[in-house]
Amino acid sequence: MPVPGFAESKLDLPQNPNFVSGTANFNINGNTLTIEQNTEKLIANWSSFNIGKENKVEFKQPNLTSTALNRVNSNDPTHIYGSLKSNGKIILINPNGVLFQEGSRVDVGSIIASTLNLKDKDFINDKYAFETEGLSREINNQGDIQAIEGGTVAIIASQIENKGKIETPNGAVALISGEKVKLSLNGNSLIQYSIERGVLNALIDNKQALKVDNGTIILSAKGVKEVKNAVIKNSGSLRADGITKKGGKIYLSASNGKVLNSGVIAANSQQNQGGSIRVTAENIQIDENSKISTVGKKSGGLIEIGGSWQNSNKEVFQATNTTIAEGTILDASAFDMGDGGEIVVWSDIHNSNSKTTVKGTLKAEGGKIKGNGGRIETSGRALDIDEITISTKSTDGVDGQWLIDPYNITISSGSDTNISGSFSASDNDAVINVGTLESALASSNVNVTTAGGGSQNGDITVDASITSSSSNDLTLDADRHIYINQNICSMGSYQNSLK
């Protein structure tokens, strides 16, 4: 039923609530609207839901898991300039858009803001199935959004832009772009999600800060299958650092589109093991000055860009093109104690159009006090590792491994081309610059492998002299023949292995 007594200005406070399910008491005192929710669940339809700059809306709910579904029936977007508070969970739906303006403040148990609708029946039965009923608009955040520890901030729309700050310690922040989206929640905690149907011009653009200490960050966009136009951009910071625990988890997923990163992605840990970062898309561009890290005090974490180690995890979508630009730093090292972590930069080696380009710095070093080096893989059907810098060194332990894995490989004084994996040929003739190889041997064990592919037989040819003074091992593992046309000289204690 409608509730009388609301202010005339629809820009100051929400207007004309109509109860669909549950009960609540409404009180307006000056510039503040207080909603005292009496039932575990509340459904209210509003003619508008705006909060003016000096205005406040507060939901007082029975407990942390109590939920209020607020649906806006208006042709205009929702504008939040002021303050929105709750001690429980708020769902705010407006198909014409939601704008959290600069200076706005949201303090809640959890919040889901969506331009996709949620049916009343599904909400009552704890089914969070969001779906568009026509064209949906964007959600833009320029303010501060904060949920309680262990809470969830989920934003669901066709296009999402964040120019503000979103934070929930030990919880989850999820920005999801699609036309049909399902969430699974346990109380305030996000358990899992799925995008059942993509949307045209899917876009997620983070220009500021998402922070979830010990938690999970998800940026996931799915476009229309035939168009493959989903885009995820990060020029800000995504941080899931572990303050007292293991580092958190960060996922960027645009399976039929592209991911562009020029910012910071970090799941480090000050006291424990580094966390995990996974970036998957058809095309991945990690631009210069990007910093991606899962550094841990006790051991390094996991960084997967474009795929998993030797495609061992079939659930990880394989990229077609993956580029790590010069100036980029990927770091999965241990800080004090423990082993270095794992870094994979991958594109689908079975796709004739795939290419991996790596020109940045990749580190999976052991702890400064004690610990072994980690492992790094760079793979792709065509591989360009010219100007790459690799380190899996250990101060007090065993140096780690760099895996390159293409098709035919020639080790020469020429530039690195068509290289993938420990050092493996990825497409027709692949070339590894001897300087790149020698530099890597100073801090890592190096495996050069071929599987045979393209129009080649899987041979390894050494056409330049290789000299190393380190104790690390060089392994040449060919699918067919190994041709040694120049000297391989060790002034250290390392072993050469020819297979």
Protein language model annotation of sequence segments:
Residues 1-499:
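Extracellular and secretory-pathway beta-repeat/beta-biased strand scaffolds
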